[in-house]
Amino acid sequence: MQRSKVPEDFLSLAGACGQERTFPMQKFYRLSVNIVKILTLLLAVFLFIGSFLTTCYAENMETQQVLLRFDNPLWNLLELAGYGLLFACCLSLSGKAGTKFRRGLLVFTLGLILLLGGMLIVFGRTVPAADALSVYNAAAEWIFGNKDIIHPTASYLSYYPQQLGLMAFLELLLRLWNLTGLSAPAWHFIKLVYVCLLCVAVLFQYRSLRYLWPNDWEPVSCCYLILVCCNLPMILYSSFVYGEIPSFAMLSVGLFLLLKLLADCIPAHSVETTSPDDTRVVGTSHALSAVTVFTALGSILFLTLSVMLRKNSLILIIAVLLVLFFEALRPGRSGRARIGLMAMAVCLTITSVGVLPLVQKCYEKKAGNTLSSGVTAMSYFAMGMQESSRGCGWYNGFNIDTYDAAGMNSDAANAISRAAVNERIAYFREHPGYAVNFYLHKHLSQWADGTYASRQATLATYGGRSDFLKEVYEGSLASAYIEWGNAWQNVLYLGMLLFCIATVRKRRPGNGSANAAANDDFRFRNICLYTYTGLIAVLGGFLFHTIWEANSRYIFVYSLLLMPYCAAGIHDGLVRLAAWRSNRTLTRHSNS
């Protein structure tokens, strides 16, 4: 019995119909990737120029006024050259020793974090202060049975109900500490937990490199670990009993699972076809397995926890939602995969938006009382347009004063804030030069501070701080710490810039010459949109903090998100430099 043959004309017609549907979607996807490439390149140029030419810092720890100085470009170039030599030596050792060196460097990095973080706990003696102390005390009072912290007016949480997520986390840690029966302050235990969470964050960000750049992740990971080892503000923030470190740890795990989901569980590759205009189309029919479902649920869980611990993480959630939407439309994904990614986006939206109200309802039900809606977002926008003793757009008390003046009525507070916004807009229109200077200083005070206000955030102590750390905070070593942070930040932004440049370069096919590897930038030019998740979040954070209350502490998490891209850019830059030198040597020999 002979099998019936399908006419070739029918197959050609079916393929053409499929391509008609696929190619517009492919172009739409590539257009979105190209837009992200251009915007992130512009941001990288802006950030690097600002950081390379200027430095913002605070000398007086009482007033904490942000000062601005112009840097010596030659000195900055010397510092960059020193870092470049360090990275080159690291890559050389990695090339010789291979996997053993990379694994040893990972163990060394995690050990260094534990060592320095532990030493900071013992000798730094940092204690919670300001908002951190208020949240800590609220958690402690709740454990002692004081339900008055849940009150519509007479409570810190009635002004800032978004802190309930962090309070719930601190309550858990305090209850665990109370089980030990030790009399030492619990915040030392919390700082130890934060050091461990910082190791978790670094480990999962390190593991994410395999999915970001599968071809070059090993040398890139070495550059990444060197960046981590040199990041002193990150160590100082491990003693900051607030939401930055635990939230970033949750973000790192959630993003790792997201990248694993998109790269491994439901990849969009397998069969390739080519259109008349040389557009590459890929197709696959992967089913959604149990591993895929649990990976997606895990990513949703940890990303949601990051929002619970720090509400500003919603900026990264928005970036993730955008990536999920465009990845669902990406050609090559099966119908099940598209539906699954869209369903994941819907679930993540619901959980990230609803987690804090849910926590609030739980506490209100236990206390038998309610909280007010809290200080309004509009008042923060208004405050971000005003002068402050610390800097342009920094905290000046307008938000809480407005909320009090309005009798803790959100509508009245919003009306006052809108009037203040309109007043400042009118003033900016009348004085455009002042407006440019205001927002330039606001930008630099946040993004050109290589310490990320780490000394200010961890300054408070009840005594016992070592003489060495006293000098770092307020003495002769403060300027050295500021310079160290400035140099590290210059490297961070330069690496980001090199990565963004590599992604927008036109592809030139390798010709077998010494610089063929440098010319063939397929590694970066054809990367997927999900690779840019961190950069999209940084772009969103840049726009948000331009209009929100200013503080360089808010930029700290974005600097951590940039480290993988910086490492990739540094590796690519060194590869191109080595190829250029090799090609130049060959040219000299051929001419002679």
Describe the residue ranges of each PLM region.
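Extracytosolic helix-loop segments that constitute the early lumenal/periplasmic catalytic or substrate-binding loops
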Residues: L133-S158, G165, S389-G397
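Membrane-proximal stem/loop segments at transmembrane-domain junctions that anchor or position
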Residues: E364-G463
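Short hydrophobic/aromatic helix or loop-helix immediately within or flanking a transmembrane segment
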Residues: N137-A138, S155-A184, H188
